[in-house]
């Protein structure tokens, strides 16, 4: 087993996740089996209860793990299915150590950060690194580990020390360290400054870790002079100073790394043997054939981004629009669908509460409704709490009555049902148990009986579940290539509330058809309005399984229907 550790310096959000994912993808393209681990040095057990405004989206895995959004990048780049143990947090490690201490497993010793915490970190890494992530094809050859945060942060010190010990535990020939740093340019001088990188690597080396590679983030390509300076002062071989400047799209990052010979340098450093012929190139191109499909993705993304045709405009009506990372997987799923249909797509962000007259200024209200009316399609993503709910209900009503393509996800399905109950069924006070006071109206969405009302973390209906199609005479079944009643698709879930089973038959009879249910036949998973260009909502989160090479069917349906509407305008 070979280990590649990716650390970051100077500031957070520098791009460690994309660089780690790109490195892993390159190695996988060479025929190697690759897995990934993300270390998050916070005391939370997982990301499940963290604010989307502070942390971005919570990514959900097949096994129900609620994890950092970087694991979504790993899954999309590598096309693998990771587990919750691929995300290590300080909370998980401390919880494990304290539990062992309570059981008396330390035999009366004084339990300390070193060696007990650091030992558990190393044990966890070694155990998870050997778990298959691509079915039953075998143990991974390489594990790429991203250490979250910035080198020197007090929160990450136990992990830094554990990794220092780990390099000798597994052998230096099996351990490679990449450090991602920032090379800024001062506007007045125009010179690439290396001092932040020097200080960052000096801090890292003082902690016992010396990087094999320095990957430098910058706005423009690194000059040779800058590379030489970093090599000289940071104790990194000149060829191992890799420039990672801004590129047109993230799919260009692996290509950029390959152009600077990083794959061969990593193979040499870890004494790895690729499973493909590295000298073979794709027809009429200088790109290696093992990178050709990825280059095709990058080229396709550039093509649709730069095309002169009018783009498809999708109104994203949400609660957390102030931080787009809160919907990162939804954005990526739309991008994947956009590449698949080869048409540029633009997201218009609409804060749901601004659609409610009483909650917004006149200018915000007017602008929000203009964006909604100007869009070719509408998407209502997941969320929690009652803020903006009435705005979402107004959105669903507008989409239904205007014929505009609509996709609702998780909360979006519940919104579609509430809107239909109020305006078609005539149940004026229809609502969700999540938003309404007891006895204030007819709850068409209710709390699931098996979910805890006292504990928030890890208590929802989480992970991959089967959705059984009960009707195949509809658009969504065709998108999933389902042609027989009873066929199942597997998607990931994250919710506490469900459509009230007591109202399903009445609503279905009035035209909002429940075409997908869970394996018990009681829980509603997919609704579709038949006499509509595209009005679909699902209780699951299809965005979590969308891949660049395999776009999610509901998103393909939304963009295709929106494109048809654009053509008619």
Swiss-Prot record:
InterPro entries: Class_I_gatase-like, CTP_synthase, CTP_synthase_N, GATASE, GATase1_CTP_Synthase, P-loop_NTPase. One of its GO terms (molecular function) is CTP synthase activity. This is CTP synthase. Its EC number is 6.3.4.2. It catalyses: UTP + L-glutamine + ATP + H2O = CTP + L-glutamate + ADP + phosphate + 2 H(+). The active site is at 410 (nucleophile), 541, 543. It holds the Pfam family GATase. Residues 313-569 form the Glutamine amidotransferase type-1 domain. It comes from the Eukaryota. It comes from Dictyostelium discoideum. GO terms for cellular component: cytoophidium; cytoplasm. PROSITE patterns: GATASE_TYPE_1 (PS51273). Catalyzes the ATP-dependent amination of UTP to CTP with either L-glutamine or ammonia as the source of nitrogen. SUPFAM superfamilies: Class I glutamine amidotransferase-like, P-loop containing nucleoside triphosphate hydrolases.
